[in-house]
Every structure is written in C-alpha cells, then in structure tokens.
C-alpha cells in the first residue's frame, strides 16, 4: 500500500486503545495489534480476501477476524467487463492519441473488435467470476469457459462451461480474466509460461490480486507481443 504508514498507525492505536479495527486494503500487522493492546477484540475487513491481515498474529492474540465476502463483487465484475471493452477498443491508446490532437487515429486501427462471439475464460468461478460470466454471456453474447478446482459443472448450469485445466482456459480464451485469492500457492502463479499459451490476439484481465501475477513477465509478454493487451485493476505494489 503506497499510503501505508505503520509507525503513524501504531502511535494512533497506542493512544486510542480500540476494541475493534476496520480496514480495507491497509495492512494490519502484529505490531499494530500489540499497539492497540488487550482491548482489541476484533478486526473487520471491508471486502473479501484477508491477505492484508496477519491472521497468524491475530489467532495467537485471540483476536477475531471477520470479513464481507461478496460485498463488492458486482463492482469488481463490472470493472473487469470495462477492462475487456477497453482492451477490445484499445481505449487507452485512442484516448492518448485524441488528447494529442490525432483525431484520425481511428482510420489506422486494425486490431479492435467486438465482444460478441468471443470467448471469455475465467480462472476462478466464484461470486465475481459468475457475475462477470452473466454480464459477458447475457450482455455481450460471449461464450464463457472457466476453470475452478472447487466447483462442478452442475453447480454452474449452462452459464460457464468448465474445462479440465487452467492451461485450457489460457489456450482457448480471447479474454482471460483472473479471479483467484492470493495465497502462498497462487502467488506469482501466472507468468510467461501461461501467457505463451494464449492466442497472440488475446487479452489478459486481472481484477483479483496483483501478486498472483509475475508482473515483470507480464510486461515482457506485452513488450514482445506475446499477447495483445492487458487490463489491470490491481498491480503487485
């Protein structure tokens, strides 16, 4: 977190001695818990994912941790849909050209396309993945495939067609959208190997956690035209 000031928070917590801490993306460290003192009973996370809270430290101190899964799922799904549109229409490039006075840029664009009939591939088919699938399938007429080791086809109906492996998502999709939590197993689990599986015309969307992706390898994949576009709602740092 660019704005995280642990020392400042520690001083405030020492003064306040709170019974509860509410956070969103700010890290909650063991030192901060100790600064709050024995009054601290609960830490609340606004949203899903607990990777910014030291769960082991909270458990050791008998501090309850609660969160709100699904609280912002619709917003994240809509953001992912926007990023798909931005990639398909080369939104950032066209915007920069217009702002510089190049109003004829549209006549030279050859790699923009519609979403209808394209394939969206989901890595993770939880709440956000299913909401994005609904937008893509019902709103844009896209085909939707997905990989999720914790779900079976009957749980998804005809909304998402599950494939046998994550690799198949990367191979088949025109848009790969990442919706997985950050865990020791998923950290940097997406890199050049996965990007090289993708179609050279495909786009990569990440609206989950930045650290799941090896960012240096994503930049390299873009620079070497391994994939066409990346739409990022999150970054590593």
Segments predicted by a language model, with ranges:
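Glycine-rich Rossmann-fold phosphate-binding loop(s) that bind the pyrophosphate
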Residues: 125-126
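Conserved S-adenosyl-L-methionine
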Residues: 138-143, 224, 228
């Amino acid at each position: 977190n660019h704005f995280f000031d642990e020392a400042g928070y520690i001083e405030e917590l020492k003064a306040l001695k709170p019974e509860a801490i509410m956070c969103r993306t700010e890290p909650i460290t063991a030192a901060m818990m100790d600064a709050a003192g024995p009054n601290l009973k609960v830490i609340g996370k606004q949203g899903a994912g607990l990777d910014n809270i030291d769960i082991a430290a909270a458990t050791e101190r008998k501090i309850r941790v609660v969160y709100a899964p699904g609280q912002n799922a619709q917003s994240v799904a809509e953001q992912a849909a926007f990023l798909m549109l931005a990639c398909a229409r080369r939104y950032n490039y066209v915007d920069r050209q217009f702002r510089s006075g190049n109003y004829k840029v549209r006549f030279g664009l050859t790699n923009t396309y519609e979403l209808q009939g394209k394939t969206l591939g989901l890595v993770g088919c939880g709440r956000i993945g299913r909401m994005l699938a609904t937008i893509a399938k019902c709103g844009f007429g896209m085909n939707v495939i997905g990989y999720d080791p914790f779900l079976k086809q009957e749980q998804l109906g005809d909304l998402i067609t599950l494939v046998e492996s994550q690799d198949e998502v990367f191979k088949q999709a025109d848009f790969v959208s990442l919706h997985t939590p950050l865990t020791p197993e998923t950290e940097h689990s997406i890199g050049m190997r996965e990007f090289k599986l993708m179609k050279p015309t495909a786009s990569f969307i990440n609206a989950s956690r930045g650290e799941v992706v090896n960012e240096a390898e994503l930049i390299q994949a873009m620079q070497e035209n391994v994939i066409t576009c990346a739409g990022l709602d999150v970054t590593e740092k």
